């Protein structure tokens, strides 16, 4: 098999000979497909967010892929003649442009070979066997030559001076505009405890992160089709590492407060964009030395950037616990394992790897770039369940060559990145749909067989990629940086080769494992002879949008998120369906057609496979998914990453999902586990830890109880039509209106404050926010009495006399508002009297008390010292009647009765019934 596949691209002195496998000379790939015209509509058909009618797609492409491709990747202004209307236009625009440049650059042995390459690449793309990263679809063949940015990933650098810091922001803006993302390590910037050369103290990297985050948030990546993407890295020995660890978690508390106040906290909402540090992923760079210090509970120095002196010493384990605690709260920061990363570095003599792209899969030298592409693994599964090695290796050859050609004519945001991209020519070939493939094969994601299959496929992909790289180098020469890094690069190749022979033979089908090992044997041998055209070959990217383009069930290396999904229908609307890989798995496991139909119907009804008729208990692990009742453990995620990592040039973009009940210790253990198992990076997500959560599972998944939390409160929204009462008030020289909306039972559920201050003034904004917060609290069940207790007699300007005889004097606007609400919605006369609210009932009571003095033994008499328990004393002890003082002694200007509980809560004396001021207690 492997020998036949190796014919895909032979090398001659003139260039590469391209064999056809997916196409036939003289027959265009488009002619082998059935096509149809559809409408691409996103959102409500009556008022769609996007609409393009009459677009042409292959019949095999789903409506979901149609909508996403038309909206994201078709170029040209909607409604204009230039607007693309067919997948044929989009695919040919890219494939033809790459082939054109390949011809001109001498990659092909003949025109026929160039034609074969064009046809094979077109076939691979239009049949959803592979896809390039988004910038290729955005720019290639559409932008003018010299402006065709094809890379999705960039790594930048920054020095410890203002010019460099400001330049960093400019570079990022250019990258985001082109539809790409970037990462940077800020560890060269001195900490906030370090002095400046001309006096004063440095701002520190976290302060500069604020500005960069806002800048990123203001730029829609790719002309408004994607959010800007950033990665910020800080070394674990930086003086500001603790500030860095907590910066996002602290902002997440703000997001939670906004959500509690009923602000829209979706990822693109105005409220969410006000929360800082949300446009970047944060990662801490840790070394083996630090991780060993954590394991041994040793001290760890945070050192100055200027002279290397220790500024602060902490416990390494405490620092790791802080990282885990912050990640528990908000999923950041992640971890990057610096020593491991640089151990597998092919170009260490040029410089170390200090950072990554936003998703942590591309790791290379500073000021460098990588263009990505991904293969759809399910397209290489034969009907009998075997893996089609020949098709896969051929696709690797074609797509890898296309990526290599892209490097040469792609544009780059800076001169330094341009030089490094063309000198090192880093590529990022990867795959998607691994989770679906494993399920279809009847293999649990968390199993030794599943990990062995994933490792073998990854080994084959990277070995074949470097084999192709060496073939290209035989014609064009190796990459410019190869000579100075030759021994290091070749040593890393041997490390990959050795890892391929560590996969257990009995766990993988022989043709696949044989091809994987043979590809590495050939890659190492050819590299020793010719060198390599590319410093890096593969990564495992998240394949977000392009996985939908390829109609993948799962992204990157991820398992299935849920067994049920919603399919967009061609005529509009949605239909709930069971993932196709479920039925394939059941077939592989030997279930009959009728049994599969029963199980399928059960999943559709219950949104889970647990309890399905005819399903054997031993097969349940095959259907474990990322979240839900039978979710894959975090160790299962980490073990899968560890199976693939030895065969990748870069790293793996993957989220390790943990349930909401996971603890801080679980996260710290996961970070340690990732280090021990040889990962390059690890990101954790505890379910529910983000205020704006991007992806939800199906409604049928049972929610586990929150860790150490009470059930979440429910909001009792106001009816559409409700009664209200509006009250005009004045406090000092300030006037305004309070409107209180009522539930059908007459209780208050919302307040509005109007005409308080000028439009746009601080006081108006604050009072509007105050009213919103109070309204939300009332609707979530906070008792009005609690608000009244908290805000009554709160003192600040404006304060003064009012025109309300019930509340003659107010210490502040919240004081007046709360006491007025109490006067209208609280019937407890004692309570109102204790607040100095002189309602008619309170005045009548006072007059009655003065006219008919009560006996001291009545329990809560008018001596001003009652504790509310009926004993007539302040301390709760009963005084003998013989010693009781006559009640008439206390009747002159008797202050309002203050129940002991209320007095203790307010810690104030009763109010004067003339001016409303709180009197000082004298006994």
Across the structure, where does each feature detected by a protein language model lie?
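Residue-level detector of intrinsically disordered/flexible regions characterized by low predicted structural confidence
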Residues: 5, 9, 77, 698, ...
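C-terminal accessory/binding modules appended to enzymatic or scaffolding proteins
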Residues: 636-661, 728-741, 746, 858-923
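Extended catalytic cores of very large enzyme megasubunits
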Residues: 1-779, 788, 805-807
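Phosphate-backbone binding interfaces of nucleic-acid-interacting proteins
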Residues: 756, 760-840
């Amino acid at each position: 098999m492997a020998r036949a596949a190796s014919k895909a691209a032979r090398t001659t002195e003139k260039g590469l000979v391209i064999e056809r496998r997916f196409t036939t000379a003289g027959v265009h790939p488009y002619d082998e497909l059935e096509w149809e015209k559809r409408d691409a509509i996103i959102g409500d058909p009556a008022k769609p967010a996007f609409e393009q009618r009459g677009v042409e797609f292959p019949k095999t492409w789903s409506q979901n892929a149609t909508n996403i491709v038309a909206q994201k990747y078709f170029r040209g202004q909607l409604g204009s003649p230039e607007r693309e209307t067919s997948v044929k236009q989009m695919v040919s625009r890219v494939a033809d442009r790459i082939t054109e440049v390949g011809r001109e650059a001498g990659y092909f042995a003949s025109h026929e070979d160039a034609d074969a390459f064009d046809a094979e690449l077109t076939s691979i793309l239009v049949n959803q066997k592979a896809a390039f990263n988004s910038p290729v679809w955005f720019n290639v063949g559409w932008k003018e030559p010299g402006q065709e940015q094809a890379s999705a990933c960039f790594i930048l650098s920054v020095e410890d001076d203002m010019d460099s810091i400001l330049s960093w922001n400019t570079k990022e803006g250019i990258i985001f505009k082109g539809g790409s993302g970037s990462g940077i390590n800020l560890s060269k910037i001195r900490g906030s405890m370090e002095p400046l050369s001309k006096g004063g103290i440095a701002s520190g990297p976290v302060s500069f992160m604020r500005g960069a985050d806002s800048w990123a948030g203001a730029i829609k990546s790719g002309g408004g089709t994607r959010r800007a993407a950033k990665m910020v890295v800080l070394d674990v020995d930086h003086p500001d590492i603790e500030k860095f660890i907590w910066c996002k978690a602290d902002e997440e508390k703000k997001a939670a407060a906004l959500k509690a106040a009923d602000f829209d906290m979706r990822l693109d909402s105005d409220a969410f964009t006000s929360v800082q540090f949300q446009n970047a992923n944060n990662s801490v760079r840790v070394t083996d030395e630090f991780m060993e210090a954590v394991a041994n509970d040793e001290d760890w120095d945070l050192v100055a950037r200027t002279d290397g002196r220790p500024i602060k010493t902490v416990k390494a384990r405490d620092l790791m616990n802080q990282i885990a605690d912050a990640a528990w709260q908000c999923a950041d920061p992640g971890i990057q394992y610096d020593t491991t990363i640089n151990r597998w570095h092919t170009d260490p003599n040029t410089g170390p790897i200090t950072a990554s792209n936003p998703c942590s899969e591309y790791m290379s030298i500073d000021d460098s770039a990588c263009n990505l592409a991904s293969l759809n693994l399910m397209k290489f599964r034969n009907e009998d369940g075997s893996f089609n090695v020949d098709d896969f290796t051929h696709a690797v050859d074609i797509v890898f060559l296309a990526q290599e050609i892209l490097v040469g004519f792609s544009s780059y945001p800076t001169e330094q990145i341009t030089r490094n991209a063309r000198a090192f020519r880093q590529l990022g070939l990867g795959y998607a749909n691994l989770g679906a493939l494993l399920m279809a094969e009847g293999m649990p994601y968390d199993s030794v067989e599943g990990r062995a299959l994933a490792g073998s496929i990854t080994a084959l992909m990277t070995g074949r990629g470097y084999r192709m790289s060496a073939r290209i180098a035989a014609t064009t020469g190796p990459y410019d940086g190869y000579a100075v890094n030759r021994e290091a690069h070749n040593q890393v190749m041997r490390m990959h080769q050795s890892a391929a022979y560590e996969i257990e033979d009995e766990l993988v089908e022989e043709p696949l494992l044989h091809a994987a090992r043979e590809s590495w044997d050939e890659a190492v041998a050819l590299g020793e002879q010719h060198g390599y055209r590319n410093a890096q070959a593969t990564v495992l990217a998240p394949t977000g949008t392009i996985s939908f383009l390829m109609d993948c069930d799962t992204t990157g290396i991820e398992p299935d998120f849920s067994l049920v999904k919603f399919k967009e229908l061609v005529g509009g609307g949605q239909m709930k369906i069971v993932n196709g890989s479920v039925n394939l798995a059941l077939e592989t496991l030997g279930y009959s057609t009728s049994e599969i139909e029963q199980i399928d119907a059960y999943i559709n009804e219950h949104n889970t496979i647990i309890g399905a008729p005819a399903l054997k208990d031993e097969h349940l692990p095959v259907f474990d998914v990322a979240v839900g009742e039978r979710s894959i453990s975090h160790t299962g995620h980490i073990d899968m990453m560890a199976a693939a990592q030895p065969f990748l040039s870069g790293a793996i973009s993957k989220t390790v999902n943990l349930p909401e009940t996971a603890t801080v210790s679980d996260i710290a253990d996961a970070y340690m586990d990732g280090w021990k198992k040889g990962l390059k990076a690890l990101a954790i997500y505890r379910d529910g830890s983000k205020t704006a959560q991007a992806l939800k599972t199906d409604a049928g998944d049972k929610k586990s109880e929150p860790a150490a939390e009470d059930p979440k409160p429910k909001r009792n929204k106001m009816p559409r039509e409700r009664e209200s009462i509006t009250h005009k008030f004045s406090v000092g020289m300030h006037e305004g209106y309070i409107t209180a909306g009522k539930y059908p039972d007459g209780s208050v559920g919302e307040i509005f404050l109007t005409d308080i201050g000028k439009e746009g003034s601080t006081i108006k904004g604050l009072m509007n926010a105050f009213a919103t917060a109070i309204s939300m609290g009332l609707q979530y069940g906070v008792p009005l009495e609690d608000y009244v207790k908290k805000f009554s007699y709160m003192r600040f300007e404006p304060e003064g006399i009012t025109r309300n005889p019930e509340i003659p004097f107010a210490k502040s606007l919240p004081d007046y508002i709360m006491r007025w609400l109490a006067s209208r919605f609280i019937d407890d006369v004692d309570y109102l009297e204790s607040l100095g609210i002189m309602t008619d009932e309170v005045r009548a009571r006072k007059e009655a008390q003065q006219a008919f003095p009560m006996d001291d033994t009545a329990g809560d008499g008018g001596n001003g010292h009652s504790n509310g328990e009926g004993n007539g004393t302040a301390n709760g002890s009963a005084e003998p009647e013989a010693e009781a003082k006559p009640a008439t002694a206390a009747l002159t200007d008797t202050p309002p009765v203050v129940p002991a509980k209320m007095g203790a809560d307010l810690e104030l004396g009763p109010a004067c019934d003339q001016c409303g001021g709180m009197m000082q207690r004298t006994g």
